[in-house]
């Protein structure tokens, strides 16, 4: 592990000034500002009633939350046997920069908004009997009338029990039935990859392979860095994080990977803010137009780029990480505020941890102008 002596000295001098508040854990942040109530709405239909219990308006961003309009995971679904229903939807990574007003929902104090969805469209309800549903997460919040994320409000719903007839549930059209009905061999010819995209994708995979490999080694030794991103210092956590990053590194290749890395949006699910998305049920990753517009590596602190996106999406695949990682929190502040168990299940924690070798540069550029130096500091 390398450090530049001069940088270490400067870092020591600046440490008191740069001390950042430790993000509050999500348990400590539950203040009932936002409540979510799940109610049955007909066989496999669910109505989520989201209420602002606070005294101020909430400006809520819906990405990867109970309010998301995409066929994403909104609730956890468990059969009475204890088995979790397989998720058949998409896990998208959204662009969180330059957000616009239309992406937010304004919720005045004591007001509610309802969101209706059918769990059968994205879950395999193959068993008859009782299913238990619950939603838990955090919704990014901007200032009222603004679009800059300043905080998150946490929610934890009631548990909803539903009696489901598997035969009837199977009659509900699933979100990606048309696409999944084709074999992988038939889907691949539709994946048009021009020379530039082929080059950029391979470069992103190779970059992610190297970065994840280095991060896996760092996780075994850098206790404080592991604590920063995964909220635990014990050897078991360091080993688990290291193993997951090693698996992501091995999967980051177009040749012989357990993940199919596509060049195009075959299913047609790229929205204007979607960078890429994964089908965990198929171990497939699809990039969106935004992916190609991003830098290979972003030289700004904790910002999104192609290499980090490959690591993030790699963590979503069950052939790489078991159980696969979900989207429980986006961005540095939210990801580092998760509990240890949830941080280890969150894709962004692995991407942020792996890309954090740029952290020294991120801190120093606040105080020192270094226009001609691009610093990469290993953990």
Curated annotation (Swiss-Prot):
EC category name: hydrolase
Signal peptide range in chain numbering: 1-19
Biological processes, Gene Ontology terms: proteolysis
Cofactor binding mode and count: Binds 1 zinc ion per subunit.
GO molecular function: metal ion binding; metalloendopeptidase activity
Taxonomy, superkingdom: Eukaryota
Compartments (UniProt record): Secreted
Main localization category: secreted
Glycosylated residues in this chain: 221
Residue ranges annotated as propeptide in the record: 20-187
Name of the molecule in the record: Neutral protease 2 homolog TRV_03208
Species assigned in the record: Trichophyton verrucosum (strain HKI 0517)
